[in-house]
């Protein structure tokens, strides 16, 4: 039984529906039942919940209403499947991941959507066209949310993180399609400020590339060993249940992982120090040839 396939976007068995004024059964006999505004369904599953307010009403009221619904326990049963909340007025929009528990709602993670140049998009018609339509809505659920095991909450990417990760994975796909592996000038830079979520961006970029099959190895390269330990823990926390992130405790382990044909060795976290020692550690020419014949993407932290 296949319930959902994140790759079947506007294709295959994916079906999209709009649910108006869904009725929520109260979890307490002391509280009234509630009615929401709009839900977006994929294969019958309510994955987006949208709360609307009129012009002139602060968007914070829509956010608070969603928080209130969560506190009252209405997001249970099938409604526990809601992944992304959207609060909207005709002139303003905020979106945020469902944290599961109402106490975990955090205004710092309520985001506005923006275009590729980071210009905010707030008009409801553009939001409907650029964010809530297919394929974007399906992509956001399937590829640009992360279940973070470190704090037990769902995270959704900001718009600039989406554009960065998408651009990186698209670049690799283009190189593969054009058979340009081995040529020069195939890299690029993504500028992130402190606190802007570069770890999630780098992980999602690596994950998208690994899952696409456009590269044999994706190596997250850090410049300090202590950073590698933290990055490995972060990557492990972000990875899907069927994904494996490989650490490297020595240069020899790194060489083994790079040579491996096992799919579980695709995502690798290592340090510049270990990478620089590959030849110095007496790597034989046969091993180097095996590694050189692989399609390897390096994602460098704080380059």
Task: Name these PLM-found stretches.
Residues 71-73, 206-207, 252-256, 282-287:
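A generic local structural motif
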Residues 94-97, 254-259, 279:
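Short, solvent-exposed polar/charged micro-motifs at secondary-structure junctions
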Residues 251-268, 289-290:
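Conserved motor-coupling elements within RecA-like helicase/translocase cores
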């Amino acid at each position: 039984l296949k319930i959902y396939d994140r790759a079947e976007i506007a294709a295959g068995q994916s079906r999209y529906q709009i649910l108006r004024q869904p009725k929520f059964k109260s979890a307490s006999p002391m509280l009234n039942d509630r009615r929401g505004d709009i839900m977006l369904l994929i294969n019958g599953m309510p994955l987006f919940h949208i709360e609307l307010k009129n012009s002139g009403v602060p968007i914070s009221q829509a956010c608070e209403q969603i928080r209130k619904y969560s506190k009252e326990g209405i997001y249970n049963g099938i409604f526990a499947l809601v992944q992304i909340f959207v609060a909207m007025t005709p002139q303003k929009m905020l979106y945020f991941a469902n944290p599961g528990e109402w106490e975990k709602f955090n205004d710092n993670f309520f985001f506005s959507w923006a275009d590729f140049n980071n210009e905010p998009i707030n008009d409801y018609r553009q939001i409907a066209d650029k964010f809530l339509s297919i394929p974007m809505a399906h992509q956001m659920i399937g590829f640009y949310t992360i279940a973070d095991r470190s704090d037990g909450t769902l995270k959704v990417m900001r718009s600039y993180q989406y554009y960065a990760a998408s651009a990186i994975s698209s670049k690799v796909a283009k190189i593969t399609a054009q058979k340009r592996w081995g040529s020069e000038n195939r890299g690029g830079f993504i500028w992130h400020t402190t606190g802007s979520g570069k770890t999630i961006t780098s992980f999602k970029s690596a994950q998208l590339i690994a899952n696409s099959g456009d590269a044999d190895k994706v190596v997250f390269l850090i410049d300090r060993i202590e950073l590698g330990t933290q990055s490995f823990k972060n990557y492990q926390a972000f990875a899907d249940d069927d994904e494996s992130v490989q650490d490297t405790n020595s240069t020899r382990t790194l060489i083994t992982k790079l040579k491996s044909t096992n799919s579980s060795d695709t995502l690798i976290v290592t340090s510049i120090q270990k990478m620089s020692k590959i030849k110095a550690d007496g790597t034989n020419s046969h091993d180097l040839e095996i590694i050189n014949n692989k399609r390897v993407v390096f994602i460098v932290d704080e380059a």
